[in-house]
C-alpha cells in the first residue's frame, strides 16, 4: 500500500474550495482565502493540497508507530463518514456528541465503557431475563445511550495519539482537551473558523457531504498504509495475504494492541453552508 494520492480536480469536484459567506469569515483564515464569488469566500486549493498531504503523512506515521487515531465529527453530515472511515482502518471515533472530559477525565470514561461492555455481556448471555421489566428497560436505555456516546471508542484502551476533526467550531471542546494533554490535532478548518489549537490545518469546506467523505476516505487510507507498515515491521508477509485480508489483519490486531497499551491517566449540499 502507499500514501493515498488525490488531485486538485478531486478537491474541486468535492467542493473543498467553497467557504462561507464573506461576512462570516474569521480573519485568522485570511491567508488561505483565494478570493470571493457571489458573496462566498473561495479557499486557495494550491495551499490546501500540500497541507492535506502533510496531514496524511502525519496520520500514516502515527499509526505506523502503533499510535491510535480518534476521528471526531458530530455534525449530522459527518456522523456516518466519520464512523465508516474509522472502522475501515481499525481506528476510533466520536460521532454522536462530545462528552466533556472524554480525554481529560479518561478514567471516568473508561468506567462508563466498562459499564457498556457489562450490559452487552448480560444481554448476550441472557442474564437480563432474570430482572424485572423495569430493571431490564433501564439497562436497555443505558445500553442505547452508552453505545451512541462511547461505541466508537469502546476498544480504544487509552488516550489517542492524534485526533482528526471535522468542524473546529463545533468540536472546540475536543480540541481544547487534546491541547491540554499535548495530543496533536489534524483538522479541516473552514473560512468561518479559527485555526488556533490545530497542529495540522486542512483549509477546506467542512459542510459539504462530498468534501467530508473525501477527507475521511483519505485519512482512513493513510491510516491503513501506516498499519501496513506496522505489520511489515512486525514481520507479517503482506504479499502472502489474500486481497482484502490486510484490513482484517489490522482489525484483529487493534484490540490486542489496545489491551497491551499502558493505562492512561486521568442534507448538507455540496455548496457553501446556509446561515444557521
UniProtKB/Swiss-Prot annotation:
GO terms, biological process: translation
Record-level GO cellular component terms: cytosolic small ribosomal subunit
Ranges of biased composition (kind: Low complexity): 252-276
Entry's Gene Ontology molecular function annotations: structural constituent of ribosome
Keyword annotations of the record: Ribonucleoprotein, Ribosomal protein
Spans annotated as Disordered: 251-276
Similarity-based family: Belongs to the universal ribosomal protein uS2 family.
Record-given protein name: Small ribosomal subunit protein uS2
Record organism: Jannaschia sp. (strain CCS1)
